[in-house]
């Protein structure tokens, strides 16, 4: 069905939340690398800030510009067939930086699960 009453700002915040969730699995997979490149690009363009209490805040005006610039960057690499440029960008930007890694480590130390696992089947039901 159609999702109604959804703003662009809602989408920005949800997208960032998705990146935070995804990166908890690491940045080794293609999805993890892509998300870290995006996160680092947004960070360097001021699309969000980290507050002193460890929370993050999206700057909606800067996020809009960053999303457009990010799409432009990717499309230019693809359109020009610039494999070497894309690979260089990947190597430089598909990493978890120190501050974010500290925050991820704190989640692990607090035993906050990366993903929820539901026990299912006959054994879980005692059958």
Question: Which role does the model predict for each range below?
Answer:
Residues 64-127:
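Non-catalytic terminal regions of proteins
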């Amino acid at each position: 069905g159609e999702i109604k009453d959804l703003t662009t700002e809602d989408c920005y915040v949800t997208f960032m939340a998705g990146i935070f969730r995804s990166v908890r699995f690491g940045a080794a997979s293609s999805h993890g690398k892509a998300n870290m490149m995006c996160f680092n690009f947004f960070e360097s363009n001021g699309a969000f800030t980290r507050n002193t209490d460890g929370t993050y805040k999206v700057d909606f005006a800067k996020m809009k510009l960053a999303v457009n610039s990010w799409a432009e960057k990717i499309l230019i690499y693809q359109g020009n067939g610039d494999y070497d440029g894309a690979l260089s960008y990947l190597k430089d930007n598909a990493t978890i930086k120190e501050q974010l890694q500290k925050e991820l480590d704190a989640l692990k130390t607090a035993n906050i699960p990366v993903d929820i696992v539901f026990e299912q089947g006959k054994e879980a039901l005692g059958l």
